[in-house]
Amino acid sequence: MLERKKPKTAENQKASEENEITQPGGSSAKPGLPCLNFEAVLSPDPALIHSTHSLTNSHAHTGSSDCDISCKGMTERIHSINLHNFSNSVLETLNEQRNRGHFCDVTVRIHGSMLRAHRCVLAAGSPFFQDKLLLGYSDIEIPSVVSVQSVQKLIDFMYSGVLRVSQSEALQILTAASILQIKTVIDECTRIVSQNVGDVFPGIQDSGQDTPRGTPESGTSGQSSDTESGYLQSHPQHSVDRIYSALYACSMQNGSGERSFYSGAVVSHHETALGLPRDHHMEDPSWITRIHERSQQMERYLSTTPETTHCRKQPRPVRIQTLVGNIHIKQEMEDDYDYYGQQRVQILERNESEECTEDTDQAEGTESEPKGESFDSGVSSSIGTEPDSVEQQFGPGAARDSQAEPTQPEQAAEAPAEGGPQTNQLETGASSPERSNEVEMDSTVITVSNSSDKSVLQQPSVNTSIGQPLPSTQLYLRQTETLTSNLRMPLTLTSNTQVIGTAGNTYLPALFTTQPAGSGPKPFLFSLPQPLAGQQTQFVTVSQPGLSTFTAQLPAPQPLASSAGHSTASGQGEKKPYECTLCNKTFTAKQNYVKHMFVHTGEKPHQCSICWRSFSLKDYLIKHMVTHTGVRAYQCSICNKRFTQKSSLNVHMRLHRGEKSYECYICKKKFSHKTLLERHVALHSASNGTPPAGTPPGARAGPPGVVACTEGTTYVCSVCPAKFDQIEQFNDHMRMHVSDG
């Protein structure tokens, strides 16, 4: 290809100088507008040269860009436009729209505050928001372990790319970034925090304090708030304790793959970033050694625990071997938000021993949860599949009684602990600077006695501090608490399975109590709809006349004594202790029974935020969201046709296999789809007056040959819950299903 330069005429040079405005950086553009970079290629026409130079940059007049390039046989002109700051302009426009409240389609809630933003920006800037938005959430609640200001700064960072972090708030930003999974902010905040450690590290050696506060060895809480800032600034060694406490807590909630990430950062900066002299013959400080030991102990515990994922059956209690003794831990199901072991706990008296529970780490996403593990009505529960031995009626004062009186397993565990060895207890200090009223974050400490296998469960409250160190054989675990001791379902309320409601509100669905067999009819207990704001559920008793829709009362599941005993004796068959008295259907798990009761009550607590359609189960809502997203994940391997549901693909495959398993009982004609058969039968029904297959039993047609009266006749679709009064509308609806595959 041959290239030649065309000399610029004086007229062209004068025109380009008149239209050129030089910026400080040397480029030419109008002030306040994005910088445009035009490159003219193949321009033999002088008229086009004038238009090009009127918009080109000043650097286009020098070097190889100072001329027009033309080639033989080419007459088309191509312009290359490069807007250097176009992305920043778009983000600034989006941020301005967010501040004005325009086009905001996502609500972020934290500590009762509400932040509005655009879902595209949140999904692009945070994997946490992306996972939530892919599930169809438009109202997202952030765990209340961080401040509103930290989340606000991170959202502003997504819109601007600029984040200003001071030394005092680096930990709060690091915690919030860990929850939102913003890796760039995590790396930068970790570096800032580590530099802060280097500034005050000599003070640690001088003060003689070996164990930082917040570690398992010190037994102190890693909680902090803005009220401590003055105290921490005057005491540098406490600042280091606070730093390590937050880093250790962050490493506990970041998954098995990054558990030692933050502690490793502290250790590595001890040698590199801090600029400390390193002698190969000198041992590490004791607190560095303890970091290694604690990190290795936690990794060994996580790797040796046999059950770290969900299981459909109730897991058996397991024994966890520690450095000194054994801890008897009953594994329960997981909470989806595993941040710092946030639970409501209370202080127990000395020498009390009770069975504690532990939630497993979240190894998979919400889509991989087995159906037997989660209560899909918006409440995550830790419910076993075995029937309860003793069921108590829920009363108005049950919530208070459950806190004052221990349950039977707790009483049984107290007896051997009375004669056991003494253990260190928790002491609260009224003037402690560690007291915090802003952030609610508790931890459950299980202290292992050196001379006994029994474990003592210490439960510090929110506003407590440790007066003396606890033994080094401790394991930080979380406790799954029940809202009440008598209400068996649900046991744990989490914010991840929210009910998507109107106006951005999240509600708790109705709950059902369980009653023992032979206890007689009891009224139902429903929970009043209320936002998930950390407050306990309020219950109201619904009397039997209130259920006017049904002739019989909706009772609690009745254990099948005869069938259960027969199955136990023979060792064969599956035990289904929960029976619905309305339709006599039996269930193995209690949560499945509760889901089934939605069919009778007609309650649909899950609502689509786009079309406002309600569903009884969360699974139905997730499947429905596919209709809005348009994702067709199931493809036919023969004709490459795609479908939104797997069931639609299975029905479609009958066409390729030539299966016609549906036969008309009138004309014996066969069909491959059930919908085609029902549509065909409906045509027979319209001609001879016979009610269609979806007609209720009470609506019967008249004599043969007479068209039945359509009043009271309902045509029910067998694919979806749609109902029609006219046969024409029913036929049109069935054609829609057939065309969909």
UniProtKB/Swiss-Prot annotation:
Residue location of crosslink Glycyl lysine isopeptide (Lys-Gly) (interchain with G-Cter in SUMO2): K330, K371, K723
The compartments listed are:
Nucleus
Quote the annotated effect of K590Q.
In PRIMS; does not affect subcellular location; strongly reduced DNA binding; reduced ability to repress transcription; dominant-negative effect of the mutant on the wild-type allele
Keyword Repeat (UniProt): yes
Please note every region of biased composition (Basic and acidic residues).
1-17
Compositionally biased spans, kind Acidic residues: 354-367
Q: What is the effect of changing H596R?
A: In PRIMS; strongly reduced DNA binding; strongly reduced ability to repress transcription; dominant-negative effect of the mutant on the wild-type allele
Keyword Nucleus found: yes
Q: Which residues carry this modification: Phosphoserine?
A: S353
Residues where Phosphothreonine is found: T211, T357, T690, T695
Listed under subunit, the entry gives:
Can homodimerize. Binds to DNA.
Q: Which PANTHER family match?
A: AGAP004733-PA (PTHR46105), ZINC FINGER AND BTB DOMAIN CONTAINING 45 (PTHR46105:SF22)
Name assigned to this protein = Zinc finger and BTB domain-containing protein 20
- Identify the species of origin: Homo sapiens (Human)
